[in-house]
């Protein structure tokens, strides 16, 4: 007689074992119709799964993140179903969930075209409208192998053979189509109402370039058609803001196959990058950080001690010389501990805040590289704070304040916070993880911050707080992190110590923190957020002074020199072109201010000022212009309430 406890604390007793769906039906027909699955004692279960003993149950609908995830996964199966009907010879590989949607990797002779995508999507919609039931069968290993061998699904066979310890597999029956998955999935295809296939890309089987190149069909899926419509509208806007296109048209940077995943910064892009870096450098000064620099390449033994070699070696670039193995650093923390360890610190010296604009390299798969957003070489605005356990809360709170102030200065005021706990693959003892997680979560609560819990998503060495900013078209970007680390400073790792008040050696707590994350990625976010129309303080070129005729050139150059002495980034346009042409060209380059000099301006010692939006601000003397620009720049990117 299982007793089911619901999230509101209410209990329901049943005579016999009961399915998740039967519990939903017992509560109400409306809830049963909306129920996709359930969390039974924290574990996701099918709506058809039996509950045989007392349990806590959360019913999952499309209003829940879990529900969206399940629906999107089922949409991948629906894609597989449609593909096999249209292309019976296609071989199905894997079809997981990704952000906002799903994909399926397939091996087939035909090259899928945009027109083919429309036909595949049409077939998916036809199948979904039938609301056919999805049936799961736990199938013995031998039978599962036989099923996929008979269907000539070579990739499914390989997956089964690579899991020798599994005795049975979940096979999902979609009418005549069978797929393999851990699940759960929707009870019937009526839950899939709003989706769209977006594009096709190439992908190596299992991400290994030695394997066959497959076709990967991507799609997005949402709970209802309005959400899908809003998302597609956002994507249209994002296409116009693509930092790769703007990077080219604004002459900021380029990427090249000569160096996959690594940016070539042009003068204007380098200026923008430097402005961002120098802003962060000033924050270091104001918040009592000490800036350091550590080697790019360090001995393998350091990475073995730190735990990176065991957990991260597949993503590390390595080299060898004089019979010694080295790794190009993927992270800065081990190097920072070497700097900390160079001197023996007292508890009176703590906290010690070490910061670095550290260039790191990670061997990301070529298929995942994307402009500045996903790269192999990037600079982290990285810092590590060595402190006592008693100082954790104050230091974490200071980091949180720095995050929010920094994002506000760059024009972001919608920040989401997530708290990630211990992953399965980790270093350190559970009692140490308990301390670390409790310390971070308590600081969040004391700061009255709303946050989402992400179980199992922490770093291998400690739990973390993640900060995600929402841009002007509603996209969410994960940037800042604060991570608590009780492990890497321990004797069996990198053995950082300080002398405590008891005159004994103790291991400090290490707080990893990054505000922007990757500078390259953050610049890419800024380009898309502002569509290249940067606030004046960020703009690579803040002003252009255009002469109307050659006779005005000397005056223009002198005016520009004076502006440069006041720290402004200014260019002179002395070309023998019509002034209207010059204005249009610099407007397309998103320059905040265009100054025009003709006979009247030269005679009066002024310039005519046009703002980026096209507004003619009139004539300004040099002093008036300096006052106006200084006020503009002082606002940084902060959003001014009207």
Curated annotation (Swiss-Prot):
A Gene Ontology term for the protein's cellular component: cytosol
Main location: cytoplasm
Residues of the TGS domain: 1-61
Residues the entry annotates as binding Zn(2+): 333, 384, 512
CDD domains according to UniProt: TGS_ThrRS, ThrRS_anticodon, ThrRS_core
Transmembrane annotation, as ranges: none
Keywords (A to Z) from UniProt: Aminoacyl-tRNA synthetase, ATP-binding, Cytoplasm, Ligase, Metal-binding, Nucleotide-binding, Protein biosynthesis, RNA-binding, tRNA-binding, Zinc
Compartment(s) of residence: Cytoplasm
Keyword Metal-binding attached: yes
Catalytic activity: tRNA(Thr) + L-threonine + ATP = L-threonyl-tRNA(Thr) + AMP + diphosphate + H(+)
InterPro entries (UniProt xref): aa-tRNA-synt_IIb, aa-tRNA-synth_II, aa-tRNA-synth_II/BPL/LPL, Anticodon-bd, Anticodon-bd_dom_sf, Beta-grasp_dom_sf, TGS, TGS-like
Subunit structure, as described in the record: Homodimer.
Family under the similarity heading: Belongs to the class-II aminoacyl-tRNA synthetase family.
Protein name, entry field: Threonine--tRNA ligase
The species this protein was found in: Hydrogenovibrio crunogenus (strain DSM 25203 / XCL-2) (Thiomicrospira crunogena)
Gene that this polypeptide is encoded by: thrS
């Amino acid at each position: 007689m299982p007793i089911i406890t619901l999230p509101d604390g209410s209990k329901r007793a049943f005579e016999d074992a009961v399915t998740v769906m039967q519990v939903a039906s017992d509560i109400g027909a409306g809830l049963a119709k909306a129920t996709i699955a359930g969390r039974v004692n924290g574990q996701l279960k099918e709506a058809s799964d039996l509950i045989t003993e007392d349990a806590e149950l959360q019913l999952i609908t499309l209003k829940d993140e879990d529900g969206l995830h399940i629906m999107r996964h089922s949409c991948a199966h629906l894609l597989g179903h449609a593909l096999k009907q249209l292309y019976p010879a296609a071989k199905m590989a894997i079809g997981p969930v990704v952000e906002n949607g799903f994909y399926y990797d397939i091996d087939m002779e035909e090259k899928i075209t945009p027109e083919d995508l429309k036909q595949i999507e049409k077939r998916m919609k036809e199948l979904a409208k039938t609301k056919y039931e999805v049936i799961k069968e736990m199938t013995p290993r031998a039978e599962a192998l036989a099923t996929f061998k008979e269907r000539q699904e070579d990739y499914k066979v390989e997956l089964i053979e690579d899991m020798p310890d599994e005795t049975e597999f979940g096979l999902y029956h979609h009418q005549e189509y069978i797929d393999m998955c851990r699940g759960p999935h929707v009870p019937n295809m009526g839950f899939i109402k709003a989706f769209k296939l977006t594009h096709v890309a190439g992908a190596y089987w299992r991400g290994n370039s030695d394997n066959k190149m497959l076709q990967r069909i991507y799609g997005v899926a949402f709970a209802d058609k309005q959400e899908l419509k809003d998302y597609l509208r956002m994507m249209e806007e994002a296409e116009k803001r693509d930092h790769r296109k703007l990077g080219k048209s604004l002459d900021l940077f380029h990427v090249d196959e000569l160096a996959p995943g690594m940016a070539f910064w042009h003068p204007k892009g380098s200026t923008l990058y430097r402005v961002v870096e120098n802003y962060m450098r000033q924050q270091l000064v104001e918040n009592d950080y000490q800036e350091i620099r550590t080697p790019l390449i360090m001995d393998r033994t350091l990475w073995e001690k730190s735990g990176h070699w065991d957990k991260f070696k597949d993503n590390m670039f390595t080299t060898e010389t004089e019979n010694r193995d080295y790794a190009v650093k993927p992270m800065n923390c081990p190097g920072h501990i070497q700097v900390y360890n160079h001197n023996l610190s007292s508890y009176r010296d703590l906290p010690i805040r070490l910061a670095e604009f550290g260039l790191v390299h990670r061997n990301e798969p070529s298929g995942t590289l994307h402009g500045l957003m996903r790269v192999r070489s990037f600079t982290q605005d990285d810092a590590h704070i060595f402190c006592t356990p008693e100082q954790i809360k104050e230091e974490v709170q200071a980091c949180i304040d720095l995050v929010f102030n920094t994002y506000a200065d760059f024009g972001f005021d919608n920040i989401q916070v997530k708290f990630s706990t211990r992953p399965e693959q980790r270093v350190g003892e559970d009692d140490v993880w308990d301390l670390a997680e409790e310390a971070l979560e308590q600081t969040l609560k004391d700061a009255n911050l709303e946050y989402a819990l992400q179980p199992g998503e922490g770093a291998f060495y400690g739990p973390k707080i993640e900060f995600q900013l929402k841009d002007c078209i509603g996209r969410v970007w994960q940037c800042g992190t604060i991570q608590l680390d009780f492990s890497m400073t321990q004797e069996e790792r990198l053995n950082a110590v300080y002398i405590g008040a008891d005159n004994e050696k103790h291991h400090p707590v290490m707080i990893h923190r990054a505000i922007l994350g990757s500078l390259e990625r953050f610049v890419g976010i800024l380009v898309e957020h502002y569509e290249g129309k940067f606030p004046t303080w960020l703009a690579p070129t803040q002003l252009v002074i255009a002469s109307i005729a050659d006779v005005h050139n000397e005056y223009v150059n002198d005016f520009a020199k004076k502006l440069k002495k006041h720290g402004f980034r200014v260019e002179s346009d002395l070309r023998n072109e019509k002034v209207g042409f010059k204005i249009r060209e610099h407007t397309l380059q998103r320059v905040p201010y265009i100054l025009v000099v003709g006979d009247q301006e030269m005679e009066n010692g002024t310039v005519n000022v046009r703002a980026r939006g096209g507004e003619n601000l009139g004539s300004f003397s040099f002093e008036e212009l300096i006052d106006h620009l200084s006020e503009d720049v002082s606002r940084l990117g902060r959003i001014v309430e009207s």
